[in-house]
Amino acid sequence: MKPVRLPAAATLALPRWGLVALCLLYILPGILRRDPWKTDDAAGFGIMWTMAHGSLADWLSPNIVGLAMPNEAPLAFWVGALLIKLFGWLLTDAVAARISTLVFFAIGAAAVWRTAFVLGRRNEAQPLKLAFGGQPAAIDYGRTLADGALLIYLACLGLLLRSHETATPALHVSLVAAAFYAGACLFDKPNVRSAAGLGASIGLLVLARGWTVPLALSIAMLALAIIRYRDSLRQLLSVAVPIALTIPLLWLLALRTLLPGSEVADAWLAANLKLLSTPKLFTLSFLAKTLVWYSWPAWPIAAWAVWAWRAQATLHVALTVSGILALILLSLVTNSPKDHELLALLPPMAILATFGLPTLKRGAINAIDWFSVMTLSAIAGFIWLGWIAKQTGWPPKLAGNVFKLAPGFQPEFNVFALIIALATSVGWLLLLRWRLGRRPSVLWRAVVLSTGGLVLCWLLLMTLWLPWLNYAQSYASVAGEMRQHLPADYRCVDTNDLGSAQRASFAYLGELRFSRPGDAPCDLLLVQDDGLRKRGAQMKKIEGDLTLLWQGRRPADRHEFYRLYQRNAR
C-alpha cells in the first residue's frame, strides 16, 4: 500500500514569482561589490580571465597566466570567459565572470524542480484515493513535490558557498541535476530526445569536472535500465552513450590537432586517474562527518523517504537511490576527498527527500521547524550583533575579536545595505509568524523555514559584512601595495611557490605580467612562503644576485608572506 494519504489542500503550490524571487535572493547577493576571494573562487576566475584575454591555446588548455591547471576541464571557464568578453567592459571582468554562477544555478534549480515534477506526477507516486474524493490532481501533486525539492535543494548547507564561486563545482552540481532530469524523462517515457539530453548532460559533465562522476552516474543509469527499465535500454545505448563519449572526445581531439605536442590531454587524464584510490578509513570518516552537515536537511528526510516507500517499486526511489549509492561508492574510492566533491549528492538527495515530505510525522516536522528557528535565528542574531560591534565598538570584546581577525580594517556604513538587511529580517519574522502561527498543511511546510533562514543569513552576510569579508578574503590590498613597488620598465615576473589563487589575484588586481612556459628568465621574482620557518629553505632555491624591492602579506593572513626581488644584471 502507498504510504501517502492527503487532501488536495496539502498540495498548494508556491506562486511562480515567489519561487523565482527566492532563487534570486539566494544567488544574487555576492555577485556585486566584491573582488575574487582566496582559494577556488580566485583560481577559477583566473582561468576565465586568462582565456578571455588570451589565445586559442588558453581556451583549449585551462591555465592561470601560464600556470597549467591539469586537473581542470574547460567548460565552466569557457562560459565565464565568454561573459567577460561580452560584459567585462561594462561590469568589470570579475563581475562579468560571476554572472556564470547565476547561469549555472538557474540550470541546477530548474533541473531539480523539473525532475521532481516528472517523477511526482507518475501514478505510482500519487497518494491514495480518499473514500469520498478530495485527493489532489496528479499535476498539482507533482508541482507541490517539485516546490519541496527546490526548497530542500536551496536549504542544503553545502550548496550555499560553492554555488557563489567562479569555479567548476557550481556548474558540476547543476549538470548532475540535469542528468537526473534527463534520466527521469527517459525512464518515464523512453524516447530519443530524453536519451540525447542524458548523453549531453553526461558528456558536458566530463568537460566540466572530469570523468569520475559521469562514469559513476552512467553505471547507475545503465544498471537501472538493465534491472528494471529495459524498454529504455536501446535509446540509452544507441543515443545517450555515443553523445556522452563524443562531447569530451571533441575537446581532446581539438587539443591533439590544434596544439600538437601539447601534453594537456595526457596530464588531464592522469590527474583524473589520480583522484581514485583504494578505500581508506580516513575517507569513510571524512564522508560520515562531512555529509551530515553538508547535505542537511536533505539527508534525514531522504532516509525517511526510502523507509516510507520501501514496499513500493517506484522510479523516484530507484533513480535517486541508485545515483546516491553510485556517488557514495565513488567518494569512498576517492583519493584525499574534498567537501565540494560531495556536491553531486545534493540533487538526488533533495529530489528523494521531497517524496518523504508527505509521509513525515507531525513530530518530525516540528523538530525540523524548531531546529531551523532556533539555529538560524541565533545565527542571524549573532550576525546583527557582530555588525553592531563592528560599527560601534560595543560589545568591546566582540568588537576586538572582529578587528583582530582583520587588522587594519576600516568600517564603512552603507544605508542601502542596511535597508536590505532590515527588510530581510522583517521578512523572516513574517515567515515565522505565518509558519508557526497559522500552521499550514502544505507539504513543503517542513523545509520552508530551513530555506528561508539560510537565505536570511546569507543576505545579512552579503550586506552587513561584505566589506569586512572582502577585506579578509581578497588579495586586493596586498596586490595594490605590491604594484606600487614594481619598476616602471620591468619585463615580467617569475614565481617561486606562488599558489594558483594568488597568481590569479596578483595578475588581475595587481596587473603583474607573469612569465609563461618557454619564456626567458624574468627580471623580477615573486616568492611566497609561510614565514621565517621556511624562508631559509626558500632562499636556497633562489639563484642569482637579487635586490629586495618589497615584502608584505595580507593583513588578515599570518601564514602567507610575499617578497618581490629584482634580478641584478651581471
What label would you give each PLM region?
Residues G44-G54, A200-H340, P348-I351, I368-F416:
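Transmembrane-lumen/periplasm boundary regions of multi-pass, lipid-linked membrane glycan transferases
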Residues A421-W434, V442-R567:
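Short periplasmic/luminal acceptor-recognition loop of GT-C membrane glycosyltransferases, typified by
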Residues G158-L171, G210-W211:
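Short acidic/glycine- and proline-prone juxtamembrane loop motifs at membrane-interface regions
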Residues T144, A179-G197, I202-L205, W309-R310, ...:
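Membrane-interface transmembrane helices that cradle and orient dolichyl/undecaprenyl
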Residues I99-A137, A155, A178:
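Transmembrane-helix motifs of polytopic, lipid-linked glycan transferases
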Residues G158, H172-D188, M349-L352:
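Specific aromatic-rich, kink-prone transmembrane helix
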Residues M1-L28, R143, V239-I243:
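Start-transfer (signal-anchor) and selected internal transmembrane alpha helices
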Residues Y26, G44-A68, L75, L82-K85:
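Extracytosolic helix-loop segments that constitute the early lumenal/periplasmic catalytic or substrate-binding loops
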